[in-house]
Amino acid sequence: MACFSNETQIEIDVHDLVEAPIRYDSIESIYSIPSSALCCVNAVGSHSLMSKKVKAQKLPMIEQFEIEGSGVSASDDCCRSDDYKLRIQRPEIVRVYYRRRKRPLRECLLDQAVAVKTESVELDEIDCFEEKKRRKIGNCELVKSGMESIGLRRCKENNAFSGNKQNGSSRRKGSSSKNQDKATLASRSAKKWVRLSYDGVDPTSFIGLQCKVFWPLDALWYEGSIVGYSAERKRYTVKYRDGCDEDIVFDREMIKFLVSREEMELLHLKFCTSNVTVDGRDYDEMVVLAATLDECQDFEPGDIVWAKLAGHAMWPAVIVDESIIGERKGLNNKVSGGGSLLVQFFGTHDFARIKVKQAISFIKGLLSPSHLKCKQPRFEEGMQEAKMYLKAHRLPERMSQLQKGADSVDSDMANSTEEGNSGGDLLNDGEVWLRPTEHVDFRHIIGDLLIINLGKVVTDSQFFKDENHIWPEGYTAMRKFTSLTDHSASALYKMEVLRDAETKTHPLFIVTADSGEQFKGPTPSACWNKIYNRIKKVQNSDSPNILGEELNGSGTDMFGLSNPEVIKLVQDLSKSRPSSHVSMCKNSLGRHQNQPTGYRPVRVDWKDLDKCNVCHMDEEYENNLFLQCDKCRMMVHAKCYGELEPCDGALWLCNLCRPGAPDMPPRCCLCPVVGGAMKPTTDGRWAHLACAIWIPETCLSDVKKMEPIDGVNKVSKDRWKLMCTICGVSYGACIQCSNNSCRVAYHPLCARAAGLCVELENDMSVEGEEADQCIRMLSFCKRHRQTSTACLGSEDRIKSATHKTSEYLPPPNPSGCARTEPYNCFGRRGRKEPEALAAASSKRLFVENQPYVIGGYSRLEFSTYKSIHGSKVSQMNTPSNILSMAEKYRYMRETYRKRLAFGKSGIHGFGIFAKLPHRAGDMMIEYTGELVRPSIADKREQLIYNSMVGAGTYMFRIDDERVIDATRTGSIAHLINHSCVPNCYSRVITVNGDEHIIIFAKRHIPKWEELTYDYRFFSIGERLSCSCGFPGCRGVVNDTEAEEQHAKICVPRCDLIDWTAE
């Protein structure tokens, strides 16, 4: 093995095998030195060697060790030559490893001296099941060169079979060979993950094999199987376990196969012999290629180096000639404090000026861990481009074009107003980093059509395609056609497909003549018809039909979009896009990703579907009713979403569910949260309304329609650089904690999901004549947020432990009567003394939920209840054709008896249970009863219901004028108990002009779970205890927040008048 280091250098002349020195030699002749030519070249304090350049030959020398007892002499005459003078230093050998005398000698003295760490490797790295690779102690590791040193191998063999004795004990002969025999006797039918070679193998042999593909962005292996192969495209189809399909090229991916040796022999497969790292780079080959380059003391243009910029990892780059930069701003500034180098990075193709000390040779960087410190996909591309440069000494086409067109790029960037640093980014210590923004043309000639750029397939609008053609955004082509001024001459026309800046969803076709005149239209034919009409006017009267046939071509044909080759290219462009949201996260080598940098979708499981998705409030008003999307079931206020007309039970869909919405759900440009109430922005993107409300720089152009969202481009640059502390995604704009001394950042919707947002705080201190209310939006991090009584989900519900009967002591009877006590007429619904409440609370500890199910003659015991839970009853899903509120209401009335059942509740009395699973947003049941006035309801409660001992009062207040009395009439909905953490909520809906109180599912409700909702009992003088048993229980049924707000008098200052004494 060859090892290189900068610590110690010695000069060694190689054995002269030819009469004249040669510049390049076979790598095998260099590393395959006879054992008689081994030299002892150990130095004190280091065992890593590096050879200097000998004349024109610059090849790395392998490290040799002198082994005691091996019979190898360093003073052999074969090492001498007339052309090369051998200077051998024989320093004293330093023992770097020591063992106690009583312990047996290790298997190999060489391993004893330099190998102390052993780790197992996979089958794909070497063609052996139980082989071990050894790591050397020191500042640098042994670098594999693709072949083992013959000299070191012979040393190991001599030590293994020499039978040397130490301390009276001899090693058993052939022990290593026996261990190797055991390793080779592994089961031939056992399957292991291996890497296979693709050279000389039938492509169909891989079909049916189980594989796993490495995704660099996720740093994970995803398992699947090979299900097909396209010979025309030379791509394999991989079907992952999650059901996603993807077409990949084996040479561009990191793939392992689960096969056995028998299957490999049957399918004629071979192991991958090259040493490939986890990043997919052929490390050994790059080391050999870099070692064959001449290493000079000074760097010259064209040399490949490792360059270091402040704040970035070591990156492969090529030194660029100073003459190509011209008048480029930023790069023509010399770095102070020494010499500088102008480099261009592989992969990113950026230009930079760095100091000389910040660049090291490529071979030194490979031998150090520089290539292992970066896992970015661009770095992988850069390493592949660097490898191709080492092989063919030719730069990638884009790098060459950027170097040749440096002047044009510089002029474009100098005139750009988007770059705030005159085309360059200034770094520390005078470094300059320039990112080229010029798009490199993709040139493809088809007949007289020159395609410059294929563009990209648009997925967020359905207007960029029709039944026969696809119009990629950014498509650019050129062709020669009859001139506008002279029909006998030809002119060059440039054709482009862009996005209309006004509609943001429709394409705009532009044809530019050589004179600079542009013809725009919504279709290709609209543009070319204008050109045809112009040419016809210029034609002479004596030859009107000369160009008649040429002027009849369709606009699509002139653009080239109807050409079969162009159609195939566009189809391949659309097929190259991943087919699922999981595949969209992948960023492989050689692929261009449409996802913005740092983006990762965040999905929030909202627990409060009864609240508005915009303002996050659950109050509903007469002039601001709730609207629920009949497709995605999102809940918003009508005014919060900009809906001016009531739907009255008709079908209502949000912007993303309506016909004409984007095919793929758009992502918010302000946060990575998926879904929610979104509106278009003025620049053609989408954003959440909640994000636009919380971010200070954004606003709404039309407050009534709540769209479009404006000010996205005015958001502070520092806000885009913040990383959310909740989701950990660096994409989007973040807000910070409202505490003056806190700088914790998070996305608005992430903070809302975590309970960090204080939605509204009224500020009535208005100045001047305007009386508009100002609302402060406050949010606090976990450290500074106020103590909240927010309840946990139903999965965190705590079941009370059942007490033993012997531990229960009944309260003392103050009257002394052993049987009864007088009825307390001042109490409501029976006894309200503390003793009675304590007895009732203790009694509930023994109560279990027991739904009433008709099942013949059988006792409903606890075991029967468990069997009900375990029974497999098919879930009743709402039919997909039912969308409108009226249809859902009709379906709920017809099926609620099949879906719900009453029974004994563990909370209080009887309750309602779900016989089938329900989804969030489903209509559960309607609360029906007798509609009375509030005054009638109060009299009935005081005069009739309070005198009925053991009976409950079931009143549902709709508003200040209407109350539903379900005590003696109505459905079983009045049996639904209260809970501080409910799984349902109540809403008033309007169907065909009539109002109905509906109980909706707030979340997914499993089978046989009890239905609960928040009563929000409002009473200033009376308190009702709660027995829901949740950790966040308020302790009372009363709506404490509403009572506190009612106790405060809040009046705007504009409504106040000066008091004058009468």
Swiss-Prot record:
A zinc finger (Phorbol-ester/DAG-type) spans 591-647. Activated via O-glycosylation by SEC; this modification triggers FLC locus H3K4me3 histone modification, thus preventing premature flowering. A zinc finger (PHD-type) spans 609-660, 722-785. One of its GO terms (biological process) is regulation of DNA-templated transcription. Residues 441-500 form the FYR N-terminal domain. Keywords: Abscisic acid signaling pathway, Chromatin regulator, Cytoplasm, Glycoprotein, Metal-binding, Methyltransferase, Nucleus, Repeat, S-adenosyl-L-methionine, Stress response, Transcription, Transcription regulation, Transferase, Zinc, Zinc-finger. It comes from the Eukaryota. InterPro entries: ATX1/2_ePHD, ATX1/2_PHD, EPHD, FYrich_C, FYrich_N, Histone_Mod_Regulator, PE/DAG-bd, Post-SET_dom. Residues 504-586 form the FYR C-terminal domain. Residues 301-365 form the PWWP domain. A zinc finger (C2HC pre-PHD-type) spans 665-698. Zn(2+) binds at residues 980, 1026, 1028, 1033. GO terms for cellular component: chromatin; cytoplasm; nucleus; perinuclear region of cytoplasm; plasma membrane; Set1C/COMPASS complex. S-adenosyl-L-methionine binds at residues 908, 954, 977-978. Glycans are attached at residue 947. Changing residue 954 to A: Deficient methyltransferase catalytic activity associated with early-flowering phenotype and reduced WRKY 70 and LTP7 transcripts levels but normal recruitment of WDR5A at target genes but without histone modification. Pfam families: FYRC, FYRN, PHD_2, PWWP, SET, zf-HC5HC2H_2. Residues 159-184, 401-424 are annotated as: Disordered. Residues 599-1062 are annotated as: Interaction with PIP5. Residues 898-1016 form the SET domain. Belongs to the class V-like SAM-binding methyltransferase superfamily. Histone-lysine methyltransferase family. TRX/MLL subfamily. This is Histone H3-lysine(4) N-trimethyltransferase ATX1. It comes from Arabidopsis thaliana. The lineage of its organism: Eukaryota, Viridiplantae, Streptophyta, Embryophyta, Tracheophyta.
